[in-house]
């Protein structure tokens, strides 16, 4: 059995079931595996930089 999660009113609800009470499939509550041999990290960083989605490039909010 794996821990599953579904969203209710913007909050996470954890369960062991594969379906939520509404009949929708639940999602895995575990993060994806980390691989030091990540072949696509360069491409992800390029795309995030292009669309200014990197956390280090967030602009401060104006006062």
Swiss-Prot record:
Residues 18-40 are annotated as: Disordered. InterPro entries: H/ACA_rnp_Nop10 (IPR007264), H/ACA_rnp_Nop10_sf (IPR036756). GO terms for molecular function: snoRNA binding; telomerase RNA binding. Transmembrane segments: none annotated. Keywords: Nucleus, Ribonucleoprotein, Ribosome biogenesis, rRNA processing. It is found in: Nucleus, Nucleolus. Its main location: nucleus. One of its GO terms (biological process) is positive regulation of telomerase RNA localization to Cajal body. GO terms for cellular component: box H/ACA snoRNP complex. PANTHER family: H_ACA RIBONUCLEOPROTEIN COMPLEX SUBUNIT 3, RIBOSOME BIOGENESIS PROTEIN NOP10. Required for ribosome biogenesis. Part of a complex which catalyzes pseudouridylation of rRNA. This involves the isomerization of uridine such that the ribose is subsequently attached to C5, instead of the normal N1. Pseudouridine ('psi') residues may serve to stabilize the conformation of rRNAs. Component of the small nucleolar ribonucleoprotein particles containing H/ACA-type snoRNAs (H/ACA snoRNPs). Belongs to the NOP10 family. This is H/ACA ribonucleoprotein complex subunit 3-like protein. It comes from Trypanosoma cruzi.
């Amino acid at each position: 059995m794996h821990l599953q999660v579904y969203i209710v009113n913007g909050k996470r609800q954890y369960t062991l079931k594969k379906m939520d009470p509404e009949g929708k499939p639940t999602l895995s509550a575990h993060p994806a595996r980390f691989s030091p041999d990540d072949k696509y990290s360069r491409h992800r960083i390029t795309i995030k930089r292009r669309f200014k989605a990197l956390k280090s490039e967030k602009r401060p909010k104006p006062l």
